[in-house]
């Protein structure tokens, strides 16, 4: 597989170079930096929650001239056309059935509230579950030494069920966060249908979210792996932190690209990255492989949200399932506007007045149209997609065709994230 091998040769440089993960100082003179979450030291925890700080260019000594051209190669050099979702379709069906079983409750209204959102908000493509199921295969499951004496087939099957459990837990956490977000944002719709807080009220929406989190906690405990519990607990904490950052930001923070990227990691990428790492941990993989799984999820999540922020300006209400321009109308400043402000500083004053005078939205759009804001945000998303693909290319080589196919599918997802229109 030409593309994956070429990515592996390039990306192995940043895996061997510990400073890429372990220090922001070594890259301080370049427009790329990595900062750790609070509570983790750079030297002893190189993979627990790094946040891209200002990833405008990857032309650092670590990467040489490796820029977003790699992404373009990914779509042309993959050996065969793959549909990542069809590869795991059967398991996605099992996962959906299991989720329906898990949200049953003694109080019928609580169960129906959770079921309402799963039917309308989760079923579709099941993006996060697809990533995690593909990652489980891509990591080429190796049986932990403690279980060597048992039947390999049985252990592998049980391990797959446990890994699928990570996908189920991740979906419940994700949906719970959406239920709570809709209350905080006073949202009317979600993916084109009435949001639960509108249909059943804020109280029931909050309780349904809490209920899903409690079921996720129970499922996590059943895995009996404290490292996995810590990873998913961190992701939940980050969801809360990111939302808090959005609603409590100062004026300067609101217009800071660093702040925006950190908030984006917390709100979107942390759950994907920590879940990917949890899948690796359950397989008994090495720390280096766990880092690669984490980095894939982190960068794919960042790319996904950057494109989402672009689509808020370029998409339509029908295709996005939400009102177009919803971010700027609610005072949420995203990458396209931040980049546009670098060219037109006067845009900041216009955006400041949007909530007082909605007519300023049109003025802001005029500035955005004259700027390279959309283009630069897309380039930044492409760079993160490239890093995600590079992480997969750095996984240990294998002759297993299923593993190769899953890795190609994960790379294909980086392409789909960038080219999606909804």
UniProtKB/Swiss-Prot annotation:
Tissue expression summary: Ubiquitous. Highest expression in seeds and shoot apical meristem.
Note: Silencing of At2g34630 decreases ubiquinone-9 biosynthesis (UQ-9) in mitochondria but has no effect on plastoquinone-9 (PQ-9) biosynthesis in chloroplast, and maybe due to the redundancy with At1g17050.
Keywords: Chloroplast, Isoprene biosynthesis, Magnesium, Metal-binding, Mitochondrion, Plastid, Transferase, Transit peptide
Binding site for Mg(2+) 1: 181, 185
Subcellular localization(s) per the UniProt record: Plastid, Chloroplast; Mitochondrion
Molecular function terms, GO-annotated: all-trans-nonaprenyl-diphosphate synthase (geranylgeranyl-diphosphate specific) activity; metal ion binding; prenyltransferase activity
Protein name: Solanesyl diphosphate synthase 3, chloroplastic/mitochondrial
Keyword Transferase: yes
Binding annotation for Mg(2+) 2: 181, 185
Alphabetized PANTHER family for the sequence: ALL TRANS-POLYPRENYL-DIPHOSPHATE SYNTHASE PDSS1 (PTHR12001:SF69), GERANYLGERANYL PYROPHOSPHATE SYNTHASE (PTHR12001)
UniProt binding sites for isopentenyl diphosphate: 125, 128, 174, 191
Organism listed in the record: Arabidopsis thaliana
